[in-house]
Amino acid sequence: MKNLLIISLVILVGCENSNKIMKHPLDNSQVRTVVLENGLKVYLLSDPKFNVSSASVAVEVGSLDNPKDREGLAHFLEHMLFLGTEKFPDVDEYSTYLKNFGGYSNAYTSSDHTNYQFQVLPDGFKGALDRFSQFFISPLFTEEYTAREVNAVNSEYQKNIMNDYRRIYRISSLFVKDGHPEQKFGTGNLETLGNTSRSELLNFYKEYYSANRMGLALLSTHSLDEMETWAREYFSEIKNYNKKRNEYDPEFFEKKETFRLVQVEPVKDIRELSISFALPGTRQLYKSKPGRQFGAILGHEGKGSLLSYLKKEGWALTLSGGAGSTTNDYGSASIRIGLTKEGLDNYKKVVKATMDYINLIKTNNHPPHIFNELKAMASLNEIYSSKGEGMWRATTIANEVMMYPIEDAGRINFIYKDSSPKDYEELLNHITPDNMITTLVAKGVEVDKKEHFYQASYSYTEDKGFYNELKVVNIRSEFS
């Protein structure tokens, strides 16, 4: 019955225009997109069912853009924007206003973007936008608060020192191509930011905080006309320096004809195997989504699947995989396997089985039914699922406004226009042993080094013999 439903949905949605928003009959929301004269792209969503109003600004700058001698500067600047503007110099003005109207705010710095967001009761939305917009027009960067906020960044860093996934991520960055920005330490601490000057903050701000590199999302019960008026009134003063989009070296991981293994000693009792492959950027392939197709095939759990085989052997408990972009220029495909104790002892057999399964995927033709099922489920979700409200939805939309064509923003996850066997096969071409690094995380693994910032113990080894084994394709009857 489920398959019949999916097939029926494919027939119904197959000829739909991918730009058309699929809506439930009772969905009375309205959307409008505008581009202000300063180049700022704006997405407006009005919904009478919302309980709160929310806004988000995404800026195309992140930890990859940190100067070599100022690791963490993008994150530090994110903190500093909350500490007063020329129009509202009181450092507590913004947070107090939001609190008085039942709201709050947040921000984060990622690899290639920074996002600021808030939510508030509808009656306080206009005033909140006035205060929020000044972050991007006239921040003070007051010297007296610099030391305080460096300590706040350092506290955030210290809080995460024992976080295994931050430790693993940091160690992984040590093995990308030498000199690539992926090697940079993103969070920052007293060591990297301790003597940062106001002029450094201002220069970084002027270099990257340009209206044409931003996306704004406003979500509220207020009308589209009201919100467009406020967007123009409060955000048109953001300066447009006509900065070009960031470009990063797509070759962030050098190919090497050997099996590369990183072993990490975790804080918690984790047993996990991660196999990663460097990819060109796939963000522009959002209409064909080859990474989702790859993940759907890899994550299949039924008879003949990789996970069912690993479970039968007593080696694995869980498996997840997929592919995506870190930036417009590069990304990665990865497979994460939760190991049993026996699987830990036989991790090479797990790696070999995984590569044999991937080779089987490669030898089969592109499976259009996978794309059609993903498309059908996405259409169902777009029509019937609750998309939520508040600042986290605003955050997602603002990021999409910044990263994708504005006409598709707000529904990137729902767009499945063209299955594109070419995109899918090109992705698979990068899933090779010479483009691979394997990370084994478990208590008791062999380690002989310590990472500087997190003091995490790890080791790195190469194995040419096992690499040659991986190149030999085994046809396993269990995968049929």
Region spans (language model):
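Stable alpha-helical elements in mature extracytoplasmic
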Residues: 69, 73, 90, 94-97, ...
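His/Glu-rich zincin catalytic helix
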Residues: 15-93, 130-132, 202-313, 351, ...
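Acidic/histidine-enriched alpha-helical segments
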Residues: 139-158, 223, 242-256, 323-325, ...
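Sec-dependent N-terminal signal peptides
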Residues: 3-12
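M16/MPP (pitrilysin/insulinase) zinc-metallopeptidase core fold and M16-derived inactive scaffolds
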Residues: 54-119, 162-164, 183-189, 300-318, ...
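C-terminal regions of mature proteins
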Residues: 21, 215-217, 369-480
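Structured mid-domain segments that build the active-site/substrate or prosthetic-cofactor binding neighborhood
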Residues: 287-365
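Scaffold signal of the M16-like zinc-metallopeptidase fold and its non-catalytic homologs
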Residues: 84-85, 128, 135-136, 144, ...
